[in-house]
Amino acid sequence: MYTQRLLRPVSQASRFSLGPWSRAAIASRQISNYTGKAFTLNTGAQIPAIGCGTFQDKEQQEGAVLEALKAGVRLIDTARVKRKQKVANAEYSYDTEPFIGAAIQKSSIPRNEIFLTTKLWCNSFHPEDVESALEDSLRDLQTDYVDLFMLHYPCTFARGEDRFPKSEDGLMRMGETTYVDTWKALQEIMKRTGKIKAIGVSNFSQDEVENLIAAGMPPAVHQMEVHPFLSQKTFTTWHKTRGIHVQQFSPLGNMNSFYREVSWSNGRANRGRLLDEPVLHEIGAKYNKTPAQVALAWGVNHGRSVIPKSTIPWQIRQNVESVFVLDLEDVEKIDALNADLRFNTPDEAYRWPLYKGLDGV
């Protein structure tokens, strides 16, 4: 299905295959939990190395997810953020769960062959609201369970239908409970209902993750912004020591136009685009791969799953072909692109000190 065992050493002839990993990976032990096209989570489940992100362009997501599934993608990531909102001068919307549910149904691919992720949005963090929010997602996704249910951010917003509740002065209204309360509720729901196979987080700091571990269970996955401009080496290495899988969102950095539009990041995002970096072109020529494929492979070679977002069929097909071995010197060349450039920084808008103590803050 997703997995294959690694049995033989790398040869020049096998360089472009999905199979055995290079001396870079073996020497660094960075992908010891890798089994071909998937990683093993601390739950024992397998998460595919390459997925499909679905942020924005909701009307195109049904076709895009169908194309991705047809191309072999088996990891689909979405979220509960609903309605198009103007946040910091840019349109912020997922609202894609119904389209993804329809695509999965039309694909005829057995549900147990798809790793489906969605997220709990911040206005549903009160423990009394978590299960109903999960049921809303399951209904729209047309499924009985999700493989991974994540806290989208550590901040809690005021309860209610409004996803971005604001006071008369325009400031976000904050909730009365904490993300730790929500985490405990998730654990209970997962154990009682079986409708969640694993729980995880997105956009948390190290201190915040440690608080979750102290609350009874480490996340299975931490989805965070990681790309060659923001490698977060110390933080991602820390996750390995805790058995928490790191998943990269925005694995192509500032290629997403959202970052060039939103006021909180456009100063940084409008620098040179990641895929214009000469080193990615040089390495791509060596392996007969595109710069995007090289950037994605860099993440996988470091032991992380990646969820690039595209609605363009040829790009989706190329993304699937991004699981290949990079030589050690090429991994190090891409590592050297790090500039601690973080593009997703809604701290002020969300009234929360996001990413405290991390690179790029």
Question: Would you name each region that the model predicts?
Answer:
Residues 2-114, 131, 252-256, 350, ...:
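N-terminal binding-site loop/beta-alpha segment at the start of enzyme catalytic domains
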Residues 33-39, 101-104, 134, 206-209, ...:
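Alpha-helical scaffolding within the catalytic cores
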Residues 48-59, 120-127, 171-175:
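Active-site mouth loops of central-metabolism enzymes
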Residues 48-53, 76, 88, 114-118, ...:
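Hydrophobic faces of well-ordered beta-strands that scaffold small-molecule active sites
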Residues 58-69, 126-141, 205-209:
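Short, acidic/polar
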Residues 105, 130-149, 233-241:
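Short amphipathic alpha-helices and their capping/turn segments at secondary-structure boundaries
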Residues 115-128, 150-156:
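Structural motif corresponding to the early beta-alpha repeats
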Residues 122, 153-361:
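Beta/alpha (TIM)-barrel catalytic core signal, keyed to glycine-rich beta->alpha loops juxtaposed to Asp/Glu
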